[in-house]
Amino acid sequence: MEKRWWKESIVYQIYPRSFKDSNGDGIGDLNGITEKMDYLKKLGVNVVWLSPVYQSPNDDNGYDISDYRAIMTEFGTMEDFDRMLAAAHEHGIKIVMDLVVNHTSDEHPWFIESRKSKDNPYRDYYIWRDGKDGKEPNNWGSCFSGPAWDYDEETDMYYLHLFSKKQPDLNWDNPKVREEVFDMMNWWLEKGVDGFRMDVISLISKQPDLPDGKPGINGYASFNEPANGPHVHEYLQEMREKVLNNADTITVGECSGVTLEEAKKYARSDEKELNMVFQFEHMDVDADADNKWTDKKMDLREMKAVLTKWQKGLEDIAWNSLFWENHDQPRSVSRYADDSAKYHDVSAKMLATCIHMMQGTPYVYQGEELGMTNVPFTSIDQFRDLDSINAYRELVEEQHVFTAEEMMRYLCCKSRDNARTPFQWDDSAYAGFSTVEPWIMVNPNYKEINAKKQIDDPESVFNYYRKLIALRKEKEIIVYGTYDLLLPESEEIYMYIRTLGEEKLLVVCNFSEKEVAVEIPEEFRKGSYLIANYPKGEIKEQMTIRPYEAFVLEK
């Protein structure tokens, strides 16, 4: 397998609004990131993926961009960005920009022009259609509730928005749109950024006839209906030729709804398109078929089957991204393990062991390395996330699918705002994130869970992450070894083997609070511990795996 720097990297995702406020306005900013570069260096990560910092009206927290070559005023200036970029590079950290080009803001100059008239030069930059029988052109739903179409009186037509009404979809079939996007990407590369995380990139090519899809719980087809459209690979290959080959970049595509076969096309080892994709099949293990709003717990057997499918399916063909968390997902220690005081630390370390020992590039979301947890929200008024607020309005107030109590329970489990509360730096007011009340509430457990408390504690979750990250840099087998699952039918234990030549590692993780007896494969019984989240027991044929225990044995 060809060795590449991005296969050996550890990526840290920063959600700037919630990372560090440097100027006392309650909102995180670029200077706050620059201020904390030493922290990132200490953790050991070598790439930072920055959620959008471009000019935006902030309908969807920066994923609605009105100017791709300007910085959102709340986050600072272009000079602040340049200073942050230089500081990152001085610390040996690369910067990856969030590229949001499936859609723009409705306040982008292109859309302002596009909606003026049917013959405007920018009309075809977006997807406009006539209505059908006085209704929307098809039954596609928006990711944020309601239809994916909005009627525009000015020209008596509908425009497509797979996300909010303020996020109209670009028409990638128009070569001028592609040229504009490629030109903008080259501009950022010339500035010195090191790559792109491509937001919902699998949605950019729509089927020309925009066919209806299967309706879900709210009567609309999924926003994912256009995923992996007819020209998506052609457009990404064009992007590779016109942009990505101009520099030694790292690229990852967010590919919601992607199949294994499609992923092989997006992230083939011949590097014609992207380096890797984010697939979300493992994020759907605890969802209902047609509804994500649930408090259903995952079945570990299904989780193992999904992750194993991707580990084996991409082996020697394409490259995996490894993650439990991002800005759109709840906190993993609350979701997949146990965030109670008794098991919090071992749970967070177990989850980290499980995912970081697989083949692929690991992504750590801010606060994950501390074991930050879901938030005990008590009222819909505490939420800031468009998705959560719209879903509450639609499913509770309008359609009465759920009661208010049910929906609050589901939001506390699944809302994106669980990941977006301020980073917990210390136990001072507002968790050391800001000197004033932040834009969203601070998780009340910040006095127990914070960076200051963990950095100097050798047994902390933070220092366990440091060890995992250091091991990945030191041991080629963790990056390049093959993966083989053991005990597929166990409901508690996730156990797998990594192999590279004569080297072998055994990874054992208990996803339950039970003590579980496990037989250790013979070849590891005379081995040694590489890492463990409990005091190390004697390695023998039969071992009792303690609640949320994780360890790695080296042959």
PLM feature spans:
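Active-site and adjacent substrate-binding regions of carbohydrate-active enzymes
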Residues: M1-S528, A532-K555
